[in-house]
Amino acid sequence: MTPRLVGKRILTAFFLILITGEFLLAADIKGYVYDQNTKEQLVGASIVLNPLGQKTLSSLDGSFSFKNIQAGTYKLIINYVGYSALETTVTVTESTGRPLVLYMLPKVASLSTVIVSSSRNGATDEFAKRREQTASSIVNIVSANSIAISPDITVANVMQRISGVSIERGNSGDGQYAIIRGMDKRYNTTLINGIKIPSPDNRNRYVPLDIFPAELLDRIEVIKSLTPEMEGDAAGGVINLVMKKAPDKFIAEANIGTGYSQLYFNRNFQSFPISTINSKSPAELSGPNIYAPVSAFPYNNLVASGSKPPPNLNLSLTLGNRFMDNKLGVIVSGSYQNSYRGSNSNVLLQSPTVPPAPDSSHSQQPAFSDIYSRQYSSKIDRSGIETQLDYNFNSKNSISLFATYLQLNERTTRITSDSLLGGYSTPNNYVGSFAIYDKTQTRSDLQSIYNVTLQGKNKLTDRLLADWSLVASEAKREVPDVAEFSVGREVNPNTNNGTFTISSPVVENESREWIHNTDKDLSGYGNLKYKTTIAGNSAVAGFGGMYRHKERDNYDNVYTLTPVSDSNSNYQQFISIPASKFTFIPYNAALGNAAGNPGIYHFNENIWAAYGQLKYNIGTKWEFLGGLRTENTHQDYLSSLSSAIAGKSANINYIDFLPSLQGKYSFDDRKALRFSYFKSIYRPAFADLIPFGERNSSGDVYLTIGNPYLNHTTIDNLDLRYEIFGKGLDQFMVGAFYKFINNPIEYAFEPDNYGGIALKPDNFGNANNYGLELVFRKFFGDFGVSGNYTYTNSEINARNYFYYIQSSGGTAYDTVHNKRPLQGQSANIANFSLLYKSTKTKIDAQLALVYTGSRINTVSLYKGLDNWEKSTVNLDFSAQKEFGKHYIFYVKVNNILNTPFQLIIKQHNNTYNSKTNLPFQESSDYVTVEYDKFDASYSIGFRFKF
């Protein structure tokens, strides 16, 4: 070997040793970033390693790492919004291995007369998780961040993602109301910033959740156990919508999006002109005793036209800042959503009476009078604005003013083909309808809610705290000129051959209706809390009360116009809607029915409440909160009913004592066991007490009639929950609940006064409702799974009729008692989501599945003929990508599986696969009475935040 070659090899070996040494001296820098005060992980904190200039972001569990860093001393610089910057020095050696644990402090602004600590961002997932963990009651929370990256844009649709919650959908397929733990929507209460708000619904107390744009919220809290300081009229739960609050520094957020419904890929959107619609009825414009001319009912809003709708529009803007040396905080947030939704619907109209069963061992079969084939086209404008001003006088006294205005305008065109089932005539082999009515209905449904709340917080002494609220709220609904035009044709079977002929169309009666109502609340709240010690343990005694005065006014006036006969006194032949001629028969029909319409009423309600409670901690493990609340209810109303009819007016008074006890045992700082007992009530809806009939929306098939003999409902509630809050966003909860319900209110079919069938509320004895809840969320790096499952079992003793043929040949009516679940309760509901969340790529995505088990929609008068909503599986998708620090692009897809809404009767379908089979039937195991399809919808858009 030559010396030159030996030298090369030695030099190569030297460099290999040097490189290997450098590699061996390299190590990873790992660590976690936490909040100094709460010990929560900080997600998305910016970490810079100098002098290398390497950058990274903390992950979902607050962790970060820099790979293969050579031995030496480095400086870490950590920044996070709302926190003071942190700098620390780290030395890398061969043995470096233990992760760093870094704590950041929230920024503190020093004022001349007041110290204001930077408030936590209530819109984050971390805040929601921490609040669930530290709350005094059992609660589930969804943050604004989770809402933004979910497939949903309204509060109602977000609700279906929460444990124990299912939703009821409207004609457009969007959610409207929440059912919590199997308790129908009537048993739940909606709050804005902890304050109860009135409902624009013309019959009920519950608030339509689709009126709330999700962009206005910081978070949604579903409170499942009540403390004494909370109002007691909630059995299922309380939905607290926490609006955005004034920030600690300037913020600007905006959203612009668009979308489309797949329904209108296949058909046109039907619209109608609104310029000629009068907001008030002729009787309101001219006076109650003035006969309205036919010209007061222009035809323009009945002439529907079809075309492809424009894309949907979704806009929002939020601005906030602090002024006057940070004493004054201001935020203004607004949202506007314009969408075109709809559905294709098929309905079998059920007859008021059903034929008898062949004997006592067989079931009765349902009977149907009509088949409705409908197309709904709805233009929905949803807008909202909320503002808050808060002023800190000093460290002991502050005041705030919240104002919220919400509006939901829905203009719906409903095209109906109504086939009259007159029966079957087998001799001529004809099976089908005996008349066809083509109907056009146009409806404007205008709802609004405003709320103004003035609140103050005062630290009277070091131990004594006070807070108070003065509240004014109003909810309105206007449904001006619900117009329906109908054309009828006779169907005449031909002899023996099974064919038929259809007569030329004739003009039928025209209906025009005006509905409007207002619900006004004036409320005052006051609370005192005194901090003390008992037996060496910390305690807080609380006392307070509230008063609410509610006034509800309801107006309803219906006009029926009769077509003018031709010169031969025959039916008027249909040419066109503008060419159709009408008159009033009898002549006083021109007054409408307002004079005797019980839908015109004035309702007063006064509620006084007081409570006392004690929060007591035993060491660091036990926490108790218990006390007693009393609520005194005074109601009176006066309607336009005849004085000879029960329910024209009433005075109703009752008092309730509502005890409550919440307990919590903490195994450590992440694991706890909660338990609670509380008593709650449900006050009947206003219109449920007044016996007038009305169709509440364009989708209603049956009249709803009130019952003046209803009693209010009382409920005893028990809860138990075990919870684990893991690292990052991981969590696990499992719990059980039980409710004993005295005098539950359910809607049942009953014959009306006109030979038809109507829905009527009634008390149904006692009921038991119990169940289990499971919640989980777990991330594996950037991927995760989340979900919840709720099992609910309820039992109510119901009374039904059973009509059958006796062995003697006669018929008999028996009153039978049978057990069934509560109306609206699904035995099983579940959510499951596949998640992707990367702080490095700034991509969030989720594929979300919701399962809702079958549930009773309407209770039948007859045994075994209840209407059930068939179980559903809904699949949605959303994803977003953040660009830089300020811009986000998102996409959302809803109802990917095109899941229909179906009502069924769980009786054997005797006519299935037979000559007399009814339309849109799917199985011999049940009878389908309604089948609605909505199709998928798509949204894309941009958000920015400064």
Q: How does the language model describe each region?
A:
Residues 67, 167, 195-224, 244, ...:
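Short acidic/polar hinge/loop motifs at secondary-structure boundaries
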Residues 156-196, 219, 237-238:
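Extracytoplasmic beta-strand/coil segments of soluble accessory domains associated
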Residues 431-455, 595-608, 681-733, 738-741, ...:
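Outer-membrane beta-barrel signature, preferentially recognizing the C-terminal barrel domain
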Residues 851-858, 881-946:
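C-terminal beta-signal and adjacent terminal beta-strands/loops
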Residues 737-740, 760-856:
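Gram-negative outer-membrane beta-barrel transporters
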Residues 28, 300-415, 419, 661:
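Transmembrane beta-barrel wall of Gram-negative outer-membrane proteins
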Residues 100-102, 211-255:
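A beta-strand signature from Gram-negative outer-membrane beta-barrel systems
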Residues 34, 46-48, 79-81, 97-148, ...:
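Short, acidic, small-residue-rich periplasmic hinge/interaction motif at the N-terminus
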